[in-house]
Amino acid sequence: MNKAEKACEELKAMDELAAMSSPVHSMQPLSKLLLTVFYIFVTVSFNKYDITGLFFMLLFPVFAYQLAGIAVHTCFHKLRIVMPLVCAVGLFNPFFDKNIIMYIGSIGVSGGVISMLTLMMKGEFCLMASFLLVATTSIEEICRALRQLHFPKLLTSLLLLTFRYISVLLEEVAIMTEAYHLRAPGQKGIHISAWGSFLGQLLLRSMDRAEALYESMELRGFYGEFYYAEGKASNRFSWLGACVCAALIMLTRLYNIPALLGSMFM
């Protein structure tokens, strides 16, 4: 199985996750979308030195993953390429902010180290929340929720088509890669001299498939906007749960929970 085929399997696995049954899966897509956006907004609003307060924001995605029946390590495995890049964003902070702001024993910790860790945590937490939304909500439900928020139909249609038909492009890449390796057995990867013709053939084959798909869509009455199937029935408990979670998130942001807990036991 080549890399393109593995990527197709990854996409199918995401669809299987979204088709699971759990309290999180059964929530209204719009409530999940708004709650995720609210969580991300609150997470990034923490001060760059407030690492203790930010740490408690981890409780919400971890609890939601358990409630959804999805292992947390699944998120880290699926995003194994993106997460290191997010962590790398703040690597240079210790070189620019060298002021000592706290001590661990006799060891001084600079503000750059704290801000680096805070920035990494913000990125990881936001990725975890975003992945949970995609893993518990189908792309059709997400696009329908976006249309309910009056997002432009062009953007929602583009998002849906990109997600749905990226697998078609990957299938073409897999077929062409396999054909290339049959003609060049034992060669690792595709030689640089063949990159131009390979990409050109991929473009032509993709255009042919795209034209055939668009003609099929037109025959089925498509004229610029998808008509999404009826969403889940309105569930007041879904919105109640989302409001409770949003309130807890806001309380975590407004009050220093670690300091309050420390004052109770001191």
What does each of the following model-derived ranges do?
Residues 21, 25, 69-74, 103, ...:
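Membrane-helix interfacial "entry" motifs
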Residues 50, 71-72, 152-155:
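Membrane-helix interface segments
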Residues 76-185:
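Juxtamembrane/interface alpha-helical elements of multi-pass membrane proteins
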